[in-house]
């Protein structure tokens, strides 16, 4: 396995396999939200799924197993605020992530929140790594499949090897004049393993 790509390099690594996927990718990349975050110097844009080496990526749940047509159609775009203060993720969820027909499975949403809150909190931790100790989720309203979603997270507290984060998922697209509504929200506690310290 070679060296890990930089955040900037991940932005040009993805090649859409077909026109529909290319359209989804361009829609996210050119969305007003992505453009405003990209213009903010406090945020770093990346596509972390593409940092995982291709030869092992298919073993990763969100970058491999759940990635592809009908699921997480394209590698999500992440915008991390420096020092782990907050994070915004934009992604598309397809119809094959449904529990009931057309409604995204709650376990899928829990997985995305677990990973998203972790990616927000880890940079604030001493050695930038941790494991989920607690994840509490409130499902506010049904999340329809086949749409663009936004995951927003913020680190609320850091105490030694522990970091707390909270966040939610909302729709990217909203009617003119309306605010996005929370679809599902979560709080989490992450703990850095004792052996995580690198000498």
PLM features: residue spans?
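Intrinsic-disorder/low-complexity, polar/charged segments enriched in Ser/Thr/Lys/Arg/Asp/Glu/Gln
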Residues: 73, 84-88, 134, 148-150, ...
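Structural signal for hydrophobic/aromatic residues that build the beta-strand cores
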Residues: 113, 135, 151-153, 167
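Hydrophobic beta-strand-centered segment that forms part of the acyl-chain substrate-binding groove
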Residues: 1, 8-12, 117-150
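HotDog/MaoC-like acyl-thioester-processing domains
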Residues: 1-53, 143-145, 154-199
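Structured beta-strand/turn binding interfaces of compact recognition modules in eukaryotic regulators
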Residues: 92-94, 140, 191-193
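Flexible, low-complexity linker/boundary loops enriched in proline and small hydrophobic residues
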Residues: 47-70
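Catalytic strand-loop segment that frames the active site of acyl-thioester-processing enzymes
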Residues: 62-104
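Mid-length scaffold segments of soluble, non-membrane domains
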Residues: 103, 109-113
């Amino acid at each position: 396995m070679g060296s890990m790509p930089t955040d900037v390099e991940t932005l040009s690594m993805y090649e859409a396999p077909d026109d529909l996927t290319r359209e989804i990718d361009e829609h996210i990349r050119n969305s007003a939200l992505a453009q405003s975050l990209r213009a903010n110097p406090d945020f770093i844009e990346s596509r972390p799924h593409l940092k995982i080496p291709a030869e092992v990526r298919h073993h990763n749940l969100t970058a491999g197993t759940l990635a592809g047509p009908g699921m997480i159609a394209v590698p999500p775009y992440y915008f991390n605020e420096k020092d782990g203060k907050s994070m915004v993720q934009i992604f598309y969820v397809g119809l094959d992530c449904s529990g009931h027909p057309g409604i995204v499975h709650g376990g899928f949403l829990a997985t995305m929140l677990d990973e998203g809150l972790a990616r927000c909190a880890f940079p604030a931790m001493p050695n930038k790594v941790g494991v989920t100790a607690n994840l509490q989720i409130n499902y506010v309203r049904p999340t329809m499949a086949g749409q663009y979603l936004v995951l927003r997270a913020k680190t609320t507290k850091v105490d030694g090897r522990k970091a707390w984060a909270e966040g939610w998922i909302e729709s990217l697209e909203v009617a003119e004049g309306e605010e996005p509504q929370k679809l599902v929200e979560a709080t989490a506690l992450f703990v850095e393993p004792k052996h995580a310290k690198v000498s």
